[in-house]
């Protein structure tokens, strides 16, 4: 592909960003919007020769199914007689792998990336999608240091399980792969991804692999027995978390929900860690960590009124430009609504309680400040229940209303006819509205 060529009369193609066995990746610009994208060009003939067409189709279906602030977004797919083209979100910051090679990360910075990774995996697993090839090379960064999980070519959908409910194909890079996957037995996709996340966390802080040996058989044995040693500078809380994640027995390995409840994970991140990380760490990398892919945690302790303090990557999905639901025909199938408000937190909470009273909704408040609202009468699918969560994003508040039980159509109707009109006095912007 020649530099400055135009693809499908929609994208101006620029420099080459990378190259793989089956194609190349280019920087490009959308002619109509001016948006920067990455164009992944795949040679049809090459993938047909090796029988990978189904894998490409799977990657397309998965990337359309998974839309999350910490998953690299697929905007559209195009094709000619010779090539398939993916128009993808452009991750200007490059691979997390390269950032780790330039400088060590302290635990606070590593926690920032790990929370985003766990948030992305939690979302994917809730959609029945398992990555199966998580490693630093498949974790990209945008210009704001937001993590982007990429390369779903080896991913498995829940539908690909056998009758025993387990996956049976060994995938991934050996150094990051769970022992049950290497044994070629049936395995849980979610448990296998959790193991890979644990290896990535170790590498983020140690700057080398927990399981490494020049002899591949010896490395497999170390993985099977979870034989590793943490550096002295690891905190006790981090060691405890890794011990739970890098458990060779998948039945007792930590789940994502347990990871989110762990002491190390729940520690708040200083905003300066996000704004000043790039280029501010002077430690030099000395150890290898390449073996032979958020929304952030909502479980941080805050001062009263116990609001969550979010950073840039939490609110990226509020941007109209990132609201991709229209591409996939699900604009009216949402189970959550987001809006911002410039009113004080106390005023927003009072308004939500007034709304609940007017609609005859039962109100309960959880320990982490979430308001739980529920109808008193049964609907088509039981009682309609929703969570109202208020988060602080200076200089405004972010309010998320999420259906947790009941019929989606009833929720949409209540949102359109009752809730949104009643809250108009406190709404500044509503997700999906044109600015």
UniProtKB/Swiss-Prot annotation:
Nucleotide-binding keyword on record: yes
Question: Can you say what this protein is called?
Answer: CBL-interacting protein kinase 28
Family label: Belongs to the protein kinase superfamily. CAMK Ser/Thr protein kinase family. SNF1 subfamily.
Q: Which Gene3D superfamilies match?
A: Kinase associated domain 1, KA1, Transferase(Phosphotransferase) domain 1
Picking any one GO molecular function of the record gives:
protein serine/threonine kinase activity
Region PPI, residue ranges: 334-363
Q: What is its EC number?
A: 2.7.11.1
UniProt keyword annotations, A-Z:
ATP-binding, Kinase, Manganese, Nucleotide-binding, Serine/threonine-protein kinase, Transferase
The reactions it catalyses are: L-seryl-[protein] + ATP = O-phospho-L-seryl-[protein] + ADP + H(+); L-threonyl-[protein] + ATP = O-phospho-L-threonyl-[protein] + ADP + H(+)
Native species: Oryza sativa subsp. japonica (Rice)
What positions does UniProt annotate as the active site of this protein?
Answer: 133
Induction line: By salt stress.
The cofactor named in the record is:
Mn(2+)
GO BP annotations listed: signal transduction
Per UniProt, residues of the NAF domain are 283-329
Q: What does this protein do?
A: CIPK serine-threonine protein kinases interact with CBL proteins. Binding of a CBL protein to the regulatory NAF domain of CIPK protein lead to the activation of the kinase in a calcium-dependent manner.
Please give the Pfam families that the UniProt record associates with this protein. Answer: NAF (PF03822), Pkinase (PF00069)
InterPro entries with a match to the protein in the record: Kinase-like_dom_sf (IPR011009), NAF/FISL_domain (IPR018451), NAF_dom (IPR004041), Prot_kinase_dom (IPR000719), Protein_kinase_ATP_BS (IPR017441), Ser/Thr_kinase_AS (IPR008271)
């Amino acid at each position: 592909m020649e530099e400055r060529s135009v693809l499908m009369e929609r994208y101006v193609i620029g420099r080459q960003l990378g190259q793989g066995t089956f194609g190349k990746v280019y920087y490009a610009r959308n002619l109509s919007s001016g948006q920067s994208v990455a164009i992944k060009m795949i040679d049809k003939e090459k993938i047909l020769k090796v029988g990978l067409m189904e894998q490409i189709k799977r990657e397309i279906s998965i990337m359309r199914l998974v839309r999350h602030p910490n998953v690299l977004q697929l905007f559209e797919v195009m094709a000619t007689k010779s090539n398939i083209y993916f128009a993808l979100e452009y991750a200007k910051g490059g691979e997390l792998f390269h950032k780790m090679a330039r400088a060590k990360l302290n635990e606070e910075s590593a926690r920032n990336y790990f929370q985003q990774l766990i948030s992305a995996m939690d979302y994917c697993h809730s959609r029945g999608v398992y990555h199966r090839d998580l490693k630093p090379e498949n974790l990209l960064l945008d210009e704001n240091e937001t993590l982007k999980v990429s390369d779903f070519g080896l991913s498995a959908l829940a539908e690909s399980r056998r009758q025993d409910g387990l996956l049976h194909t060994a995938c991934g890079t050996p150094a990051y792969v769970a022992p049950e996957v290497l044994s070629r037995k049936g395995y849980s996709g979610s448990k296998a991804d959790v193991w890979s996340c644990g290896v990535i966390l170790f590498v983020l802080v140690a700057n080398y692999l927990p399981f490494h040996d020049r002899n591949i058989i010896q490395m497999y044995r170390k993985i099977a027995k979870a034989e590793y040693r943490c550096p002295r500078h690891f905190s006790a809380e981090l060691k405890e978390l890794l011990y739970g994640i890098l458990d060779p027995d998948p039945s007792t390995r930590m789940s994502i929900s347990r990871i989110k409840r762990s002491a190390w994970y729940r520690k708040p991140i200083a905003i300066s860690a996000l704004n000043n990380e790039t280029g501010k760490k002077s430690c030099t990398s000395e150890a290898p960590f390449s073996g032979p892919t958020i929304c952030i945690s909502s479980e941080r302790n805050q001062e009263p009124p116990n609001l969550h303090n979010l950073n840039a990557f939490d609110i990226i999905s509020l941007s109209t430009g990132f609201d991709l639901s229209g591409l996939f025909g699900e604009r009216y199938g949402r189970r959550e609504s987001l809006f911002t408000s410039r009113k004080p937190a106390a005023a927003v909470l009072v308004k939500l309680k007034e709304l609940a009273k007017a609609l005859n909704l039962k109100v309960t408040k959880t320990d982490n400040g979430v308001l739980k609202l529920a109808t008193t009468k049964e609907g088509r699918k039981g009682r309609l229940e929703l969570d109202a969560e208020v988060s602080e994003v200076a200089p405004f508040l972010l309010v998320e209303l999420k259906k947790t039980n009941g019929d989606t159509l009833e929720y949409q109707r209540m949102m359109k006819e009752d809730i949104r009109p009643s809250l108009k006095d406190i709404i500044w912007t509503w997700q999906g509205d044109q600015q």
